[in-house]
Structures are given as structure tokens and as C-alpha cells.
């Protein structure tokens, strides 16, 4: 190689090395990025831990009134319900350990059977059905409630996921059920950037009335809740902090997340029921109150 070519090569190498050194260092031929000279200082968004509420205490157990006679509880699993067996497991364990019977309404015995099944039970649990109830099923459910049967329904916000074919939206189908009970469920999720419990969608709720359902419930932790709109004939049971926002309504407010209309209770979340979540804060008190409501012991 001629001397002139050597000089040009050395010059090019020096320029490249200097450019790389501005933003990083070279170690054994590998570019290693340098850490930023300053840490982010924007509160809340870039440092969300500054907005976290103290984590809820994981303690307590579910105790219910043991004086009620044996009852049979039906859990709906026939309407493409979201993770129904996982979310109903704690309810099932508490009920059966107190001498009550739990049965599932399964897809294989769905057609034409709902009317018969509800006539055999004392209460019904419905967890996030993503398939609509038929007109016959809704009529049977209304008749069941009018005759003194009790229903607890857990709903959820709309969810969007992505698969090989694109976006898939899953929506809980409770609107046709709830029209008879002066309660409607939203489709958006609730969140709180200023007082959440770990993540922005993990929110705190507290009692909104002096009903037995809200007794000893001062700090419930909800994981993916939607809001409820309550008519004059229904009563709010739980509400969020006033700094809570909605992904659809886009405003801070104290949103209702549990409500009652006579023999029907609606809750805007079901994840708090699971084995890993029911011990957080006052969740076990809420679960116990809901079970006593099902058993007509409230």
C-alpha cells in the first residue's frame, strides 16, 4: 500500500473513532452506549413510583354467617365467561367449606336447560359473560330474581388483544341482563395516575353506602374495573377515589364500581376474586359480604 493510501486510511479511522466516542465507548470492537448524564426528573409519568399508594396488606380470611341452612349456588360457565373457574375458586371453596353446594352451568348442558337449572338453585353467580344471554334465559333469570333468588354479576371493561389475524376485541355482554335492574356497565377501564396500587389500572375503592354489603369495606383493591351507571332504583355500594379516570369518559370522578338493585348485585371487576388477590386490603371482607348476600344472610 502506498504511503498516501496509508495516510487516508488512518484519517478515516480517526474520524469514525471520534464520532463513535461522542455517544459511547468501544470495547474489543463492540459499541457500548454510555448512560445518560442525568436521570429523568418528570414526576409521576417517568417516575410513577412517586404516585403509588402504600401496597395493600395481604392478611385476613373470609368468614361468613354459619347459621344459614344449606343452599345451592349455580355458577354460570356457559356463556364464554372469562376465566370463570379460576375466578370462582375462592367463592367455591368458602361456600363448600361452610356446607353449601356449588354447581356449574356448563356449555354442554346449555341449550334449553337454563330454565330448569335456575329452578333448582338458591342463588346464581355470573362472571364476565362474553356471549349474550338468549331471551329465554333472560326471562328465566328475571323470574328467578322476582321469586326471591339472588344474583351476583361481575363485569369487566372491553379488552383488545392481537393475534395472527389482527386485533381481537372481547366485550362482556351484560347489557341485556342489567336493563331490568337500573344498572348499566361501561366498556372502558378505570385508572388512577395519582393514587394507584402498583399499576395505573390497579385502583382503590371504598364504601359508598351503609348497606351490609359495604360493611368493614374501606380499602378494596380492584385490578381491571369498569364503571357502573346507577339509576334511581339502584344503590351504589362501592366507589373509587375522586382522582380516578375512565378510558372512555376522560374525566376524574368518584366512579361507582359496585351497586345493588334488590336481589341483584353488580361489581365492575372480577380479578379481585382470585386466589392471589382476595387477601389484598379489605377484599376478603367484600368477598365475604357478597357470599352472605348470595346466602340471603345479609
Walk through the language-model features, giving the residues of each.
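Short, surface-exposed patches at the edges or C-terminal ends of soluble domains, predominantly
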Residues: 2-298
Amino acid at each position: 500500500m502506498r504511503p498516501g493510501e496509508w495516510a487516508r486510511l488512518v484519517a478515516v479511522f480517526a474520524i469514525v473513532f471520534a464520532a463513535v466516542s461522542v455517544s459511547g465507548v468501544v470495547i474489543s470492537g463492540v459499541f457500548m452506549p454510555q448512560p445518560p448524564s442525568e436521570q429523568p426528573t418528570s414526576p409521576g409519568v417517568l417516575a410513577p413510583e412517586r404516585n403509588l399508594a402504600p401496597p395493600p396488606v395481604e392478611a385476613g380470611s373470609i368468614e361468613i354467617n354459619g347459621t344459614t341452612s344449606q343452599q345451592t349456588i349455580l355458577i354460570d360457565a356457559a356463556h364464554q365467561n372469562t376465566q370463570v373457574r379460576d375466578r370462582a375458586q375462592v367463592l367455591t371453596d368458602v361456600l363448600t367449606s361452610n356446607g353449601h353446594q356449588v354447581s356449574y352451568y356448563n356449555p354442554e348442558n346449555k341449550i334449553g336447560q337454563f330454565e330448569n337449572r335456575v329452578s333448582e338453585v338458591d342463588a346464581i353467580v355470573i362472571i364476565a359473560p362474553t356471549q349474550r344471554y338468549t331471551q329465554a334465559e333472560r326471562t328465566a333469570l328475571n323470574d328467578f330474581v322476582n321469586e326471591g333468588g339472588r344474583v351476583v354479576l361481575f363485569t369487566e371493561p372491553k379488552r383488545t388483544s392481537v393475534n395472527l389475524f389482527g386485533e381481537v376485541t372481547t366485550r362482556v355482554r351484560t347489557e341485556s341482563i342489567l336493563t331490568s335492574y337500573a344498572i348499566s356497565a361501561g366498556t372502558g377501564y378505570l385508572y388512577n395516575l395519582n393514587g394507584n396500587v402498583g399499576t395505573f389500572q390497579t385502583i382503590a375503592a371504598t364504601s359508598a353506602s351503609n348497606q351490609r354489603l359495604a360493611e368493614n369495606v374501606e380499602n378494596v383493591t380492584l385490578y381491571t374495573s369498569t364503571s357502573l351507571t346507577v339509576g334511581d332504583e339502584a344503590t351504589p355500594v362501592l366507589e373509587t377515589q375522586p382522582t380516578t379516570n375512565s378510558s372512555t369518559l376522560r374525566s376524574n370522578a368518584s366512579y361507582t364500581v359496585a351497586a345493588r338493585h334488590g336481589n341483584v348485585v353488580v361489581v365492575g371487576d372480577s380479578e379481585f376474586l382470585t386466589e392471589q388477590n382476595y387477601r389484598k386490603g379489605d377484599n376478603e371482607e367484600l368477598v365475604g359480604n357478597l357470599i352472605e348476600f348470595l346466602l340471603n344472610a345479609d
